[in-house]
Amino acid sequence: MKIRERFSMVDLPVLIITAAIIGHDKYKAFHAGANDILQKPYHYSEFMARIQNLIMMKHTANQATRMEMAFLQSQIKPHFLYNVLNTIISLTHLDIEKAREVTEEFTNYLRMSFDFQNTSAISSFRHELSIINSYLSIEKTRFSNRLEVLFDIDEDIDFILPPLMIQPLVENAVLHGVSKKRGGGWIKLTAKKQSKNEYHIKVEDNGPGITPEKQIDLLSTDFDRSVGLKNINQRLKHFCGSELMISSTPDAGTSVSMLIHLAETTGSPKELKDTERT
C-alpha cells in the first residue's frame, strides 16, 4: 500500500471495504497497512461504528503524544534549576551584568521549554536550536572554561520534527559526558541535510563514555542516562520509522545520532508558523 510510504497507520487510518476476502488476503491487507476490513454486505450502523473507532484511535494517539510532550517538559531536573539559581545568586555578588544575562537566558529556556506549542505533535529544528542555545549559554557560565561547545550546522537548514527531540541529547552530553571529566570537555552538535527530505543530527561528547554492557540498556527505562532517550526513540520511530544510533567508547566519548526522513506531505517550518498564527 503506497499510502503507507507517506502516512502512518495513526496519521491516516484506512478501512478496506470488500465484497469477499479470504484469510490469506486479509493477512496481506493488514500487512500492507490497513487498519480494519469491512466485508459486504454490511449494515450502515456497523460501518459508522468502524469509522468512529478509527477516529477515536487517531484522537487517542494524538492525546498520548501531547501527554508525552508534557512529560518531557516536566523532566527539567530539579538539580539543574538549583544549580542555575545558585549561579545567578553567586554572580549578583561578582558580576551584575552577567547575572542579568544568565537570568534572561534562563527565562528564555523555561519559556520555550514550556511553550504551549511544544504540546503539539510537531515543532521545527530552529525552534529547538533556540532552546539548546539558551541551555548551553547557561551551562557555559556554570562550567566556565570547562565546557567547550562546537556546532557544525548547515546554514539554511530547517525542518519539521517532534518537539524536544535534540535538547535532551545535548543535556545528556553535558550531564553524563563533560561534567564527569575532571578538566571538562567538549560537546558537538551536527545538523546536515542529506537529501531533499532527509536530515542527519548528531550530538557528541568526549566524556568518559559508556561500557558496551550499559549501552544495551541505554534505551530502556532502567538506566539513568536513558531518561528521555527511550521516549525520543519511540517518537522517532513513530514520526519517520528510524531509530536513535548510539556509539560510545570508554574514556573516549559518546555519540548519539538520528536520521530524520520526511514524507513529501509532512510540511515545512513556514507552514507550521503560519498555522500557529491562525
Curated annotation (Swiss-Prot):
It comes from the Bacteria. InterPro entries: Bact_2-comp_sensor_kinase (IPR050640), CheY-like_superfamily (IPR011006), HATPase_C_sf (IPR036890), Sig_transdc_His_kin_internal (IPR010559), Sig_transdc_resp-reg_receiver (IPR001789), YpdA-like_HATPase (IPR047965). CDD domains: HATPase_YpdA-like. GO terms for cellular component: plasma membrane. SUPFAM superfamilies: ATPase domain of HSP90 chaperone/DNA topoisomerase II/histidine kinase, CheY-like. Residues 1-55 form the Response regulatory domain. GO terms for biological process: signal transduction. GO terms for molecular function: phosphorelay sensor kinase activity. This is Putative uncharacterized protein YwpD. It comes from Bacillus subtilis (strain 168). The gene is ywpD.
